[in-house]
Curated annotation (Swiss-Prot):
Lineage of the organism: Eukaryota, Metazoa, Chordata, Craniata, Vertebrata
GO cellular component, one term: Golgi membrane
Subcellular location: Cytoplasm; Basolateral cell membrane; Golgi apparatus membrane
Region listing for PEST3, in residue ranges: 405-449
SMART domains: CNH (SM00036), S_TKc (SM00220)
UniProt-listed Enzyme Commission number(s): 2.7.11.1
Main location: cytoplasm
Identification of the protein by name: Mitogen-activated protein kinase kinase kinase kinase 2
GO BP terms, alphabetized: innate immune response; intracellular signal transduction; positive regulation of JNK cascade; protein phosphorylation; vesicle targeting
Residues annotated as catalytic: 136 (proton acceptor)
InterPro entries assigned to the protein according to its UniProt record, in alphabetical order: CNH_dom, Kinase-like_dom_sf, MAPKKKK, Prot_kinase_dom, Protein_kinase_ATP_BS, STE20/SPS1-PAK
Organism name: Mus musculus
Chain's gene name: Map4k2
Amino acid sequence: MALLRDVSLQDPRDRFELLQRVGAGTYGDVYKARDTVTSELAAVKIVKLDPGDDISSLQQEITILRECRHPNVVAYIGSYLRNDRLWICMEFCGGGSLQEIYHATGPLEERQIAYVCREALKGLHHLHSQGKIHRDIKGANLLLTLQGDVKLADFGVSGELTASVAKRRSFIGTPYWMAPEVAAVERKGGYNELCDVWALGITAIELGELQPPLFHLHPMRALMLMSKSSFQPPKLRDKTRWTQNFHHFLKLALTKNPKKRPTAERLLQHPFTTQHLPPALLTQLLDKASDPHLGTLSPEDSELETHDMFPDTIHSRSHHGPAERTPSEIQFHQVKFGAPRRKETDPLNEPWEEEWTLLGKEELSGSLLQSVQEALEERSLTIRPALELQELDSPDDAIGTIKRAPFLGLPHTESTSGDNAQSCSPGTLSAPPAGPGSPALLPTAWATLKQQEDRERSSCHGLPPTPKVHMGACFSKVFNGCPLQIHAAVTWVHPVTRDQFLVVGAEEGIYTLNLHELHEDTMEKLISQRCSWLYCVNNVLLSLSGKSTHIWAHDLPGLFEQRRLQHQAPLSIPTNRITQRIIPRRFALSTKIPDTKGCLQCRVVRNPYTGSTFLLAALPASLLLLQWYEPLQKFLLLKNFSSPLPSPAGMLEPLVLDGKELPQVCVGAEGPEGPGCRVLFHVLPLEAGLTPDILIPPEGIPGSAQQVIQVDRDTVLVSFERCVRIVNLQGEPTAALAPELTFDFTIETVVCLQDSVLAFWSHGMQGRSLDTNEVTQEITDETRIFRVLGAHRDIILESIPTDNPGAHSNLYILTGHQSSY
């Protein structure tokens, strides 16, 4: 590792006392510190340096900070290298970043935005006059002092323009704020300091709308759109809310052609920035940020108040004694089950389920999107489990900054139009290997990370597991007499307390039950929305809910913490309503996923070959494909297929094939009678687009499948009316397993266990061996009607009296096997 210039080798602890961690920069964590010499506060960025690390960017940051002294640039104090730790010490800005501020206050007023733009332009003009480019202007990198001064910060990806290098040719920046000439750097031949002017225009929109344009898209897709010649510069969504001066200022700053885009100096002469703008505008903003009760009212509140009249807590009725148990409850403790089989296409939710290791760069293909991917990886060189991060504050920069990447080209983008779609023959799921020149499609921020999924899972506090006991599981009652009209249920483990929770989605809202405190026997309301579907990914609860049926994403740890605080300070009005009213939508713990209004059904699937996780959403006239983006902990739109599904409310099952980045969607299957007959899958190949004229057999006719489940990379369970076929992805019977499992009742739901298939019907369940078709478990109770509420990780079962379908229900979970968590 080469020596850094202008860096002291003295011990920085002799001068600076670290007080607390306040955020994260491009390369390291940022701490609030006290300068013991001057007694003033300072910001200290600490970067761990390893042998072989490229320190050129760190040297660049130090050099730019040292040389650029300006009232609108964070002041540089000094740098120290001690014990492989580089300390970069700067001026402390007590107001925080503008991103943090608008999270607390909501959108800025127009004159406040104008003040920020004017001050930022002053700093940029100084930088540009010194031949330097910032290359990462955004709300997270604009800091405020307590006096309302605006400072440019985080020069970790900055560059210099010299006489010999008139244009930068590296792909660098944050996707949503990136100028078109940077996104298309190879075709455009480079860029200059005017890319900062574009980024400031995007930042102005961010401050007024709480997010940059295209923010609902996956960043890779946003970059592709920006690099196209047909791309049109963004505008403010609400034309009437803002003045013509603001609209015109943005029109100039967001001029697509950089040769016609004005400089920072010229924009400082625009009426938008020359109007009277006193510092009091931002000191008032800081006062507002410190008072959360001045926050804005979320327009989504009405969606969250559909069932506020239903109780916030529901208590279980007294459990029956042994003599009062139903016949099925007696059988539940006599019949043993294997653990549910983990599907390879299920997302990996917990830190111990996967061990991330960076692959070498030789495994990356030469496309621009993958150069973006490489840069995203370099943005987070150390990947830490969530348990290590939970005690730290959220980083100031929530959106990853792209830095150093090869100078590579943009691949041709496929059309998603149904007219240009290639048809896929029914009955065959072809997966030809990708050719050497085939570019990968939109890798996620972990697409070049390899999972090692065989680690021992941590224990959790909940229903007691009995690890490594074969066939030792049974159904246990967890709630007696539930009045809710439940549609779906999942289990979840709190990342801090390790308590296991049952989460149910019902007509009356979303409720939780702590399985570690069953002696309390109390369900607590989490969300006051009607909910018809639930799924949990990385501590984010997805629900299909609301008055107009949207897909919602809920921050589970945040909601639980919010509820804990409400219990400590109870209010006289429903707390779940008032809390939502004082939190801006951008910072809300429950948010709608855009463009999902009217969604009929959803599916989540992980590609085990690439690690990508997808969300399929079936709407009446379209199909949405979204992809999980780890840095933002959310699903972002990848493709919107305008062609409607043959039956939007019918079968929707994603199937993952080797060599295919995107899943294929099975919308039907049929199989002639006979265990050796081939099953014909009806699939829609998403990489080619939907095939609108595909023929789907009507539901309910003989030979029509009711359920399709991909249990591993080449094994699929296909459930028919009275049998389950076990086939490969080509529909052929598998040689290693029984080709057909037969049942003497009409199957409603099937679940795959470790060595058997468990089929549920209205009055019970029966398990059959995957190897021999022999009965392995059977429970029948004509006095109860059974329904599976959830089978992801844990099987959750509901039963109601046969003679009184409107009665309260009992809830059960299959427990006693090795914990699903």
